[in-house]
C-alpha cells in the first residue's frame, strides 16, 4: 500500500493524527520492529523508546512517531518519511490491521 494511503488510514483511526512528512510516496509492503525493519517497511518509535538511540541504523522506509522535535530532526536528517500522531503504538496497530 502506498505510504499516502496509510496516512489516510491513520487519519481516520484513533491515534490522533498530527502531520505527515513524506519524502517519497513508496509502497509499504510490511510492518516491523524498528530494529529489524527493512526497506519498504514501516515501523514506529515512541518518545522514550530505547531504540531511539539506534535510529540511524534502521532500514525502515517510514516511521510512525510522536511530535518530538529531536526524533523528527533525526528522521529528517536521515531522509526517513514519518507520520506524526499522539499515540504511535495505536497507529502502528491500525496499520497492522
Region annotations inferred by a language model:
Residues 1-97:
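Terminal amphipathic alpha-helical/low-complexity segments used for targeting or macromolecular assembly
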Amino acid at each position: 500500500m502506498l505510504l499516502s494511503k496509510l496516512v489516510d488510514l491513520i487519519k481516520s483511526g484513533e491515534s490522533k493524527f498530527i502531520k505527515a512528512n513524506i519524502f517519497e510516496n513508496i509502497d509499504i509492503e510490511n510492518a516491523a520492529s524498528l530494529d529489524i525493519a527493512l526497506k519498504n517497511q514501516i515501523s514506529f518509535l515512541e518518545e522514550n523508546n530505547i531504540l531511539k538511540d539506534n535510529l540511524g541504523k534502521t532500514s525502515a522506509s517510514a516511521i510512525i512517531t510522536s511530535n518530538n522535535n529531536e526524533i523528527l530532526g533525526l528522521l529528517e536528517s536521515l531522509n526517513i518519511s514519518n507520520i506524526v500522531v499522539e499515540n504511535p503504538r495505536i497507529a502502528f496497530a491500525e496499520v497492522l490491521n
